[in-house]
Swiss-Prot record:
Keyword Cytoplasm assigned: yes
Gene3D superfamilies associated with the record: Dynein light chain 2a, cytoplasmic
Cytoplasm in keyword set: yes
Database matches in PROSITE patterns: PROFILIN (PS00414)
Self-association state and partner proteins as the record states: Occurs in many kinds of cells as a complex with monomeric actin in a 1:1 ratio.
CDD domains hit by this protein: PROF
Any one GO CC term of the record: cell cortex
Keywords: Actin-binding, Cytoplasm, Cytoskeleton
Protein name per its UniProtKB record: Profilin-A
């Protein structure tokens, strides 16, 4: 299965009539493996900072998580495994696997819990596959 298929069918899937605003699978080095059409352009240092927060949980808390034009307030995640961010009625979930970051961005009417479920389910599957 291609990385784009994972994004299109597993991240951008419909959940109770709603779906993520955008999603991507990005290598630990910041290289985009696959993304949805609306996924924001981001700066390399934004991915570097996300990776640093996985290595040093709490690194992003003082400054926020930046991805493209958006700044998210970092909220409770799972140290070393999941980073969650909030902005207004939307937010972001980033799940780290052995080789990649699975990123989902949502806005109302999708809920944070639905975003977490979609992103973490694919992330957990990739971890099980050794990816």
């Amino acid at each position: 299965m291609s990385w784009q298929t994972y994004v299109d069918e597993h991240l951008m899937c419909e959940i109770e009539g709603h779906h993520l605003t955008s999603a991507a699978i990005v290598g630990h080095d910041g290289t985009v493996w696959a993304q949805s059409a609306a996924f924001p352009q981001f700066k390399p240092e934004e991915m570097t900072n996300i990776m640093k927060d996985f290595d040093e949980p709490g690194f992003l808390a003082p400054t926020g998580l930046f991805l493209g034009p958006t700044k998210y307030m970092v909220i409770q995640g799972e140290p070393g495994a999941v980073i969650r961010g909030k902005k207004g009625s939307g937010g972001i979930t980033v799940k780290k696997t052995g080789q990649a970051l699975v990123v989902g961005i949502y806005d109302e009417p999708m809920t944070p819990g639905q975003c977490n479920m979609v992103v973490e389910r694919l992330g957990d599957y990739l971890v099980e596959q050794g990816l």
